[in-house]
Amino acid sequence: MKKVILVVIDGLGLRSEIHGNAFQMANTPFFDKLFSEYPNTLIQASGEYVGLPDGQIGNSEVGHLNIGAGRVVYTGLSLINKALKDDKFKENQVFLNAFNKVKENNSTLHLMGLLSPGGVHSLEAHLFEILKQAHNSGVENVAVHVFGDGRDVAPKSIRESLEKLQELVDKYGYKIATISGRFYSMDRDKMFDRTEKAYKAILGKSGNEFSSALEYLDLQYSQNITDEFLEPAKNSTLDSRYFLKDNDAVIFFNFRPDRARQLSHLILNSSLYDYQPSHLVKVSDFVSMMKYEGIKCNIAYEEMLVNNPIGKVFEDANKTQLRVAETQKYAHVTYFMDGGVDVEYKNSKRIMVDSLKVESYADTPQMSAEEITSQVISHAKDFDLTILNYANPDMVGHTGVLESTLVALEVLDKQLSRLVKWAEKNKITVFITADHGNAEVMLDENNKPVTKHTSSPVMLVTSDKSLKLKPGKLANIAPTVLDYMGMAKPKEMNENSLLDK
């Protein structure tokens, strides 16, 4: 059976423009040879191709997850957006249970979260859809508790969102019960005096009041208070039904956990913090949009389970596998490559090469690439599949130092040349790809350093000159390797091989 080495270069995309492109500027004769003499193709590594929102830059975690899974893995916001796009909110049993609880108890459903199109902690479209589904399910009493953003979006930008929300609640006979800036409702620094102010408004115990949400916004703006710092206030036109009390149900529609946990703790009196809530309520149901670590509640959208990633396929087929990376990227070739699970397969070996302990990798752009190559050359003959990661383009690219990134790529060029020559001599086939872009964009149009990832496509190159490769995305790589090795792919791997037969 053929043996394969899969090389994942971290943070190296492809683009034709030379300006600020360390990959085009570096002296890389072996890469030049790979692209001119070996089969190669383009692989998409960002946005919807890897289960992220459209246009979003790729990252190492998502990249390795998709490579190992053999299918597009939807995570976080994109997981919920896909459910929204596919009109699946109405089938979400966790939402339906919350709706049913308030109908049975003749109580109120409280929807709370960041009213924002920002997509960092929440997305207002999710709230609007939950309102629609609550109405369609016959929920009579719904109170919305609005948190102002002004941080992931412009400081004074909530008016349009608030107008949309007001129109919807009027249509369904629901109410905007409270308003507070995220400074209060979404503190994450254990400043519970802030969180308490938002909590008291939700309980109907705030001294600040408004009769119209939009008028209250104007009043706050007139005092130079922006969305983030809107003072917690309650709607004075509402009766006690619309403020949080026993037997009510809560849906917290923030999907990101870090700034949702303190307020959740106050409502649930959880064991996550030592702080004791000023008022205790016993809600019938508490739903978080995604998992809030340390908060016990019902979760509307769980992260996707990746069954049968490439490592499991090799294990089940009684094949051997080797994983090699330096400390900085070790979790990526193990935990993320294995579907977000920490598992050591019985026919496997893992080698972690120590990353250099330095303040900045700009000072040591070679990183541990030579040692990684040496370890692979020492061990790969004994394994059916070797997966390794070279961290240089990403970690040095993040420093924003162009000269160091050029050195990093030249070091990598030499190490790849060493590895491929050895593999060819030992009749082992190499596939080379990358998890996302970075080093190919080091300067912006104003010649300022760029340190972030990119949405550039990446390479897939193979040392087997008899092959032809089709273009694809990261999720096609595992099926391609299995196809090449004559192994069946599991049903979960719904992406195709890129071998052009």
UniProtKB/Swiss-Prot annotation:
GO-annotated biological processes: glucose catabolic process; glycolytic process
Task: Give the binding site residues for Mn(2+) 2.
Answer: D10, S60, D435, H436
Q: Name one Pfam family in it.
A: Metalloenzyme
Tell me how the cofactor is bound.
Binds 2 manganese ions per subunit.
Q: List the disulfide bonds.
A: none
Q: What is its EC number?
A: 5.4.2.12
Gene Ontology cellular component? cytosol
Pathway of action: Carbohydrate degradation; glycolysis; pyruvate from D-glyceraldehyde 3-phosphate: step 3/5
| SUPFAM superfamilies, sorted | 2,3-Bisphosphoglycerate-independent phosphoglycerate mutase, substrate-binding domain, Alkaline phosphatase-like
Cofactor dependency:
Mn(2+)
In which residues is Mn(2+) 1 bound?
D394, H398, H453
Catalytic site positions: S60
One example of the protein's molecular function in GO is: manganese ion binding
Task: Report residues binding substrate.
Answer: H121, R151, D152, R182, R188, R256, P257, D258, R259, K329
Lineage: superkingdom: Bacteria
Q: Which UniProt keywords apply?
A: Glycolysis, Isomerase, Manganese, Metal-binding
Reactions listed under catalytic activity: (2R)-2-phosphoglycerate = (2R)-3-phosphoglycerate
Quote the function comment for this protein.
Answer: Catalyzes the interconversion of 2-phosphoglycerate and 3-phosphoglycerate.
> Assembly and partners?
Monomer.
Task: Give the similarity note.
Answer: Belongs to the BPG-independent phosphoglycerate mutase family.
Q: What is this protein called?
A: 2,3-bisphosphoglycerate-independent phosphoglycerate mutase
The UniProt gene name for this protein comes to: gpmI
